[in-house]
C-alpha cells in the first residue's frame, strides 16, 4: 500500500494472492509453477515498495487456489512469501511456505546426462538438508546439488 492507502495492484474478489515475493522472482514463479496456464485473470506487481523487503513482487490469480504442496514448493524461491486465500474481497486464509521433503515437477536437473532430460518423466528432488544451504538430490541420477545450482538452471 502507498502512503495514501491506495492499492497499487487491483483487488480480486476470489482467488490467491502470493505476497512478499523477492523482487525479480515473480516472473520465474509464474513460469516454473505454470501459473499462466489458465484462462483466469492474473495480476502481477513487480518491484513494488515494501517496508520489510525494500522491493517485492506480488501475484494475484483469480478463481484459483494453490494446494498445500504448491505453497510449500514456493519456499525455495520465496521463503518469506505469504499466500492469501481471498473470498468476497476478504482474506479468509493465510499461509507461509515451509520446506517440503520432496519437490516434484517444478525444477530441472542441472546434470545434463540425467535421464530426466531425455525421457518423458517429471522431475523429482529430495530435500536433503534444511540449514541455510539446502541440498536437492535428483531422483533419477541421484546427484546432489546445492539448491542455488538447481535454481539457476
Curated annotation (Swiss-Prot):
Domain of life: Bacteria
Protein encoded by which gene: pyrI
GO molecular function, one term: metal ion binding
Residues annotated as binding Zn(2+): 109, 114, 138, 141
Organism listed in the record: Klebsiella pneumoniae subsp. pneumoniae (strain ATCC 700721 / MGH 78578)
Self-association state and partner proteins as the record states: Contains catalytic and regulatory chains.
Alphabetical UniProt keywords: Metal-binding, Pyrimidine biosynthesis, Zinc
Cofactor stoichiometry and binding remark: Binds 1 zinc ion per subunit.
Example GO biological process: pyrimidine nucleotide biosynthetic process
GO CC annotation: aspartate carbamoyltransferase complex
Protein name: Aspartate carbamoyltransferase regulatory chain
Protein role: Involved in allosteric regulation of aspartate carbamoyltransferase.
Family membership noted in the UniProt record: Belongs to the PyrI family.
InterPro entries for this protein: Asp_carbamoyltransf_reg_N (IPR020545), Asp_carbamoylTrfase_reg (IPR002801), Asp_carbamoyltrfase_reg_C (IPR020542), Asp_carbatrfase_reg_C_sf (IPR036792), Asp_carbatrfase_reg_N_sf (IPR036793)
Cofactor (UniProt): Zn(2+)
